[in-house]
């Protein structure tokens, strides 16, 4: 299936769904739905482009199926561990810490098409001016330096709030609030969407190289 046929199928599917929602009693947010369709369509086109490039690079359909499954699993479940490993390498072996370390780590995380799609959707369904920032921060585990990521990387205001737990025990919970500055453009939703679509170019380059190699 080509990218154009996938685009047509997605457009038809989203269009019919939109018509159903408009005609039903369900509250329909057209802007939110359009963003969801855009992000989902972008991811679908990327995965199709990658699948096509892989099918042209391997000798059989069975290998193509296995390779595509591996790529999806790698992007979805392994890439984040790779980014965390690079982060630890930067800090422990190369002595690169602080803001630069977490800038690079977040950028690597965003290069995964499935991870970039997830954080775009998280930002979309979030509320308020801080949704974009919290979506990026949500890509990190609790072991990360939340204060540096919030303040220096995402330009937010880091603070803590006292929360009461079980047995009247209290603990401090870190909070990243909106700051006077917006999230850096290179970590904003438009930039993340560009990173997602860039994989179409990568897949096209692989397909072109494969074609040239076979043609020779």
List each model region and its residues.
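Pore-lining and gate-forming transmembrane alpha-helices of multi-pass membrane transport proteins
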Residues: 36-40, 68, 72, 183-196
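Secretory targeting signals
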Residues: 2-59, 67, 91-92, 98
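Alpha-helical transmembrane segments of multi-pass membrane transport proteins
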Residues: 42-43, 106, 199-200
């Amino acid at each position: 299936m080509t990218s154009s046929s996938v685009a047509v199928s997605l457009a038809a599917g989203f269009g019919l769904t939109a018509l159903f929602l408009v005609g039903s009693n369900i509250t329909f947010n057209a802007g939110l739905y359009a963003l969801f369709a855009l992000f989902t369509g972008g991811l679908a086109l990327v995965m199709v482009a990658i699948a096509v490039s892989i099918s042209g690079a391997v000798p059989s359909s069975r290998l193509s199926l296995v390779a595509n499954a591996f790529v999806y699993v790698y992007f979805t479940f392994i890439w984040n561990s790779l980014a965390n490993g690079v982060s630890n390498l930067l800090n422990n072996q190369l002595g690169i810490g602080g803001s630069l370390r977490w800038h690079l780590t977040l950028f690597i995380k965003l290069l995964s098409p499935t991870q970039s799609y997830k954080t775009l959707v998280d930002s979309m369904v979030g509320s308020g001016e801080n949704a974009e920032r919290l979506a990026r921060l949500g890509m990190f585990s609790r072991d990360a330096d939340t204060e540096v990521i919030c303040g220096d990387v995402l330009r937010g205001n880091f603070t803590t709030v006292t929360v009461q737990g079980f047995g009247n025990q209290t603990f401090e919970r870190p909070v990243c609030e909106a700051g006077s500055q917006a999230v850096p453009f290179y970590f904003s939703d438009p930039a993340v969407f560009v990173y997602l679509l860039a994989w179409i170019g990568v897949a096209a380059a692989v397909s072109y190289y494969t074609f040239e190699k076979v043609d020779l």
